[in-house]
């Protein structure tokens, strides 16, 4: 059985933070679009794309909840996607840094 997947496009900065192991929660504004794609769909896996390039990583979703975001200037509650941290082998195999 194939896992339900959510695909999210990230800026290069946030993508690199995931690969480096610093980021394990993705925040999305509470709106109809994300409510439908994340809360209602209940994905088990998230695919992050580095911008609109072919560079992608897959992570298993540990939980999805609603709560505050720790970033300055991001007020209110957000949809929070908690995902597994990539192992060193996974980040080396999937991610090829730009030269």
Language model feature labels by segment:
Residues 2-5, 9-99:
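Structured alpha/beta reader/binder surfaces that contact nucleic acids or chromatin modification marks
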């Amino acid at each position: 059985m194939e896992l339900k997947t959510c695909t999210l496009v990230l800026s290069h900065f946030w993508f690199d933070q995931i690969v480096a192991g610093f980021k394990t929660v993705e925040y999305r504004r509470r709106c109809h679009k994300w409510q439908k794609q994340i809360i209602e769909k209940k994905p088990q896996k998230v695919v992050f794309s580095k911008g609109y390039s072919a560079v992608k990583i897959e992570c298993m979703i540990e939980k999805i909840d609603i709560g505050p975001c720790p970033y300055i200037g991001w007020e209110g509650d957000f949809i929070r996607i908690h995902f597994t941290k990539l192992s060193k082998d996974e980040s080396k195999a999937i991610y090829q840094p730009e030269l």
